[in-house]
Amino acid sequence: MNIGAEQALLGAILSNNQAFEKIEDFLDADFFSSKINKLIFESIKKLITNDQI
């Protein structure tokens, strides 16, 4: 996948928790090609699931 697309997706789910709810069943960290984007995704996922953002 394109790094820019990965970053756009991360930005979308970070700014809109409902976007995460729509993709959480089929998207996981392995979807991301960049290691840093995988870590960012896991962090966002943890924050959203724990109602911290």
Q: What kind of region is each of these model predictions?
A:
Residues M1-I53:
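Noncatalytic partner-interaction/assembly domains of nucleic-acid and motor enzyme complexes
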